[in-house]
Amino acid sequence: MTCTIVVGGQWGDEGKGKIISYLCKKDNPSIIARGGVGPNAGHTVEVDGEKYGIRMVPTGFPNVNAKLAVGAGVLTDPEVLLKEIQMLEKFNVGERMLVDYRCGIIEETHKELDKSNEHLSKEIGSTGTGCGPANVDRAMRTLKQGKDIESISKYMGDVSKAVNEALEAGDNVLIEGTQGSLLSLFYGSYPYVTSKDTNAASFAADVGVGPTKIDEVVAVFKSYPTRVGEGPFPTEMSVEEAESLGVVEYGTVTGRRRRVGYFDHELAKKVCRLNGATQIAITCLDKYDTECYGITEYEKLSEKGKAFIKEVEEKVGVKVTLISTGPELGQTIDVRK
């Protein structure tokens, strides 16, 4: 029995979707539970060459044997949830979906307010998905809950009960975090942050799991960090430099171009300390050095690639156990014992 939490180590867009999908296939958890803010964070999962952009359904959906759960702490947009369930019909997502009846519900008014608020949309760079305004209503105790919405009633249940019973039965459980630690309302670059905490302890609380039940915390870092929206970015490079390196990306939810920077070891160390990370996953090593593309054995990495991994381990103080060398699940180096 292992309960693992996957967290983003930067400003989101670290490639958590790929790492989560890999862990779900390799470790075969019986439940994949999603924590985090809500549909403001997008994950891209590639299965057999086909890409799926999702915001509500857990990214471990390719594991067709696992139950998929959305915790009570996660804001839910019924429209987005139902569209994704339909889009992923061939993975039998609808039959495996469990949404906590206590989850907060995003309504159209929340999205309208998010988009029309100049401070949120222009100064902060909100995604406009209604999460901030919905969390305001939640704090005021006026927000609707999942149990109040007829259109998603068939998916309602007690996620905390299901997850804890799975752990008691000796099953593996994976908890998905969203966004990134540096976007935390408490520990990020305030006010350029999201509307709640985005660290491991909060993700555990989102799905109703106590801290003593957590065995592993995997912090995911991209070889070159990216950020969408406003806010400090200490190692940011120019657009021209990013283009010369072939690093041009756009946000899954917003479609906005991502800002690009160099790996920041000090920030990574801070994030690992904050989350109690037990291991690190590095993604896009093939973008840092194209010679690493598709490599599946550590010994076969280029010297440049190995040096990057070694420097991360030495300066951050946490073992790198997973290395992504391409978009496909099989393009992964796994050095876990």
UniProtKB/Swiss-Prot annotation:
Broad class of where this protein is predominantly found: cytoplasm
Binding-site list for substrate: T252, V253, T254, G255, R256, R257, R258
Record flagged with keyword Transcription: no
GO biological process, one term: 'de novo' AMP biosynthetic process
Binding site for IMP: D13, E14, G15, K16, N40, A41, G42, H43, T127, R141, Q179, T194, R256
Enzyme kind, highest EC tier: ligase
Source organism, top-level taxon: Archaea
EC number: 6.3.4.4
Alphabetized Pfam families for the sequence: Adenylsucc_synt (PF00709)
Keywords in alphabetical order: Cytoplasm, GTP-binding, Ligase, Magnesium, Metal-binding, Nucleotide-binding, Purine biosynthesis
Cofactor binding annotation: Binds 1 Mg(2+) ion per subunit.
Matches recorded under InterPro entries: Adenylosuccin_syn_GTP-bd (IPR018220), Adenylosuccinate_synth_dom1 (IPR042109), Adenylosuccinate_synth_dom3 (IPR042111), Adenylosuccinate_synthetase (IPR001114), P-loop_NTPase (IPR027417)
GO MF, one example: adenylosuccinate synthase activity
Binding site for GTP: 12-18, 42-44, 258, 284-286, 324-326
Subcellular location: Cytoplasm
Residues bound to Mg(2+): D13, G42
Pathway: Purine metabolism; AMP biosynthesis via de novo pathway; AMP from IMP: step 1/2
PANTHER family from the UniProt entry: ADENYLOSUCCINATE SYNTHETASE
Family: Belongs to the adenylosuccinate synthetase family.
Subunit structure: Homodimer.
Name of the molecule in the record: Adenylosuccinate synthetase
Source organism phylogeny: Archaea, Methanobacteriati, Methanobacteriota, Methanomada group, Methanococci
GN (gene name): purA
